[in-house]
Regions:
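Membrane-embedded, lumen/periplasm-facing catalytic core of multi-pass transferases
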Residues: 377-435
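Membrane-lumen/periplasm interface segments of specific transmembrane helices
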Residues: 204-291, 323-327, 384, 388
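Loop-to-helix entry region of an early transmembrane alpha helix in multi-pass inner-membrane enzymes
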Residues: 68, 72, 80-98, 133, ...
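Signature aromatic-anchored transmembrane alpha helix within multi-pass, membrane-resident enzymes
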Residues: 14, 18, 115-118, 168, ...
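Membrane-interface transmembrane helices that cradle and orient dolichyl/undecaprenyl
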Residues: 109-111, 150-165, 173, 197
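Multi-pass, polyprenyl lipid-linked donor-dependent membrane glycosyltransferases
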Residues: 37, 65, 88-95, 119-149, ...
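Perimembrane helix-loop-helix junctions
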Residues: 2-4, 160-163, 183-216
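Membrane-proximal lumenal/periplasmic loop motifs of glycosylation machinery
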Residues: 28-37, 51-71, 79, 83-89
């Protein structure tokens, strides 16, 4: 314990930045952590896990489309008597602190210039791109922290302790996000290169392959479980099709949004066309700059002496980023409509920051004027990032985010729903949305009549949210017929489906 205290004392600036990042997360979640479609399932699975009901999602069916890692953490908090909000607040603050300290630690290992390390660490601490993750009940905060920890462990000398930690981290990465094995494989490949000096290339490759293989055993069991439930490995997915250039363009614009401190997170149809022009231009500029810096690095590698650790961290960070971008673009076209926006690309935020910091640090500015100019630009850039984050944190903390926003929570229809008896069973054409309001039990949709019929309850209600097709025609598909209307406004209606002893199917003749 004393060693840890001394370690932190020697890195007081980094500790201060980490605490500042954690404080921003606290402020951003002051009125409640943000809630979205994914959140409803994460929370429902966590509560059902804690109550011994299995890993059931918001609609009461076994979850396959998302791994259970975050949900289990929420469930553990529930078992300890903590609310969902408090559990996630604590988790996200811890993740923010780990991410900042881990970034600084990696830069120290690489022996980066003190000022460059401070700029990079401050950017990670105050970037709105990360704050937007810390202000939601999402899997990204723990995933980012796990990636940073895995990078640190990979750089350790080969040994049983390192191998055991990598197995645990690789498994954890998968159970937090399905994309975990992509990171595990990237890290295992680079770890093979790192460990070859001790074991030789063949033995190192076999060792790291064995680590990866062992970590995939629980992954295989989970995927087989999913296949038995719905015939898929990771839930139903729909590819976007088209060219690989389309998601790569979106990624470039996302990089630009990181520079402008204006993260973009949209729906599944988000594309390059939805980004402001300034983020597009800056994103392309960032990619060109990284390419030039990498080219310069390789051209001058024989003339500039780099430490082994610096080269290793650059190789590790670059490989993780490159493989994940390639995988994400391929997945978007061939497997899943998941645009390469801020949320999708945040796992490689730290690796990319490390790449830029390591490459720019190789250029030594001999002119005092240039050094002062670089310092002034850095201060302005970081100040802009910090002010943007503070503004976002205050706004999120005051108003909430998405379905946790006060405007959404206090809608008249939602106030009415919150006053319904707690032993009621609810149905809706938007069950995940309603779950942000009704967290007492599963919310079934209009096609889950068998589950609705067998649910233990006293009375049933259906909350129908009004919506239209693209041509403006009202969408009434699956709306119950003959149910009495007990509440109505412009957003929707609440229908009385009668006692739970009655046959619910009578409303869908």
């Amino acid at each position: 314990m004393g060693g840890l205290v001394n370690y932190l004392r020697q890195r007081s600036t980094a500790v201060g930045l980490a605490l500042a990042s954690g404080l921003l997360a606290v402020v951003a979640n002051w009125s409640g952590v943000g809630w979205s479609w994914d959140t409803s399932d994460y929370v429902a699975v966590g509560k059902n896990f804690a109550n011994g009901n299995g890993l059931l999602d918001a609609t009461g069916i076994p979850m396959t489309v998302r791994p259970p890692g975050l949900s289990i953490l929420i469930g553990i908090g529930d078992l300890l008597g903590l609310s969902v909000n408090l559990t996630v607040r604590i988790l996200n603050v811890i993740c923010a602190i780990i991410t900042v300290l881990g970034t600084f630690h990696l830069l120290q290992i690489a022996k980066v210039n003190k000022n460059a390390a401070l700029v990079a660490t401050t950017f990670v601490a105050f970037s709105p791109a990360l704050l937007w993750q810390y202000s939601m009940i999402w899997s990204e905060p723990p995933f980012v922290a796990l990636v940073v920890l895995a990078m640190i462990v990979t750089l350790r000398p080969a040994g049983l302790g390192k191998f055991a930690l990598l197995v645990v981290l690789f498994i954890s990465l998968f159970f937090i996000r399905y994309v975990g094995p992509v990171f595990a494989a990237s890290i295992a490949v680079i770890a093979t290169w790192f460990d070859q000096q001790k074991f030789g290339l063949i033995k190192s490759a076999l060792t790291n392959f064995a680590i990866l293989l062992v970590s995939l055993v629980p992954v295989w069991y989970w995927l087989q479980r999913n296949r038995e439930i719905d015939g898929t490995l990771t839930g139903a997915r729909t590819p976007a099709g088209g060219s690989l250039l389309n998601p790569l363009k979106t990624f470039a614009a996302t990089l630009g949004s990181w520079v402008t401190a204006s993260p973009i997170e949209g729906g599944i149809y988000l594309s390059w066309n939805n980004y402001p022009n300034n983020t597009k231009i800056l994103g392309v500029f960032v990619l060109i700059a990284i390419a030039i810096l990498l080219g310069s690095y390789f051209l001058t590698q024989s003339r500039v002496e780099d430490s082994k650790n610096r080269s290793n961290i650059l190789l590790l960070s670059s490989t993780i980023a490159l493989i994940y971008v390639a995988f994400s673009a391929y997945r978007f076209v061939h497997f899943e409509l998941g645009p390469l926006d801020n949320r999708m690309m945040i796992p490689i935020f730290v690796p990319l920051v490390l790449v830029v910091a390591l490459l720019t640090d190789r250029f030594k500015l001999s002119s005092t004027l240039l050094r002062k100019g670089f310092l002034a630009v850095s201060v302005l850039f970081l100040g802009f990032q910090a002010l943007s984050s503070i503004n976002d944190a205050l706004r999120f903390g005051r108003d909430g985010r998405y379905w946790a926003a006060k405007e959404f929570q206090t809608q008249p229809i939602h106030k009415f729903v919150k006053d319904l008896p707690t032993d009621s069973s609810l149905m809706s054409n938007q069950p995940q949305q309603l779950s942000a309001i009704w967290q007492k039990s599963s919310v079934f949709n209009q096609y889950q009549l068998e589950l609705a019929q067998t649910a233990e309850c006293n009375h049933r209600y259906f909350v129908w949210y009004n919506s239209t097709y693209d041509d403006g025609t009202p969408n009434v598909e699956g709306q119950p017929e003959g149910a009495s209307e007990i509440y109505s406004d412009a957003s929707g209606v609440v229908l009385d489906l009668g006692s739970c002893n009655s046959d619910v199917t009578t409303f869908w003749p």
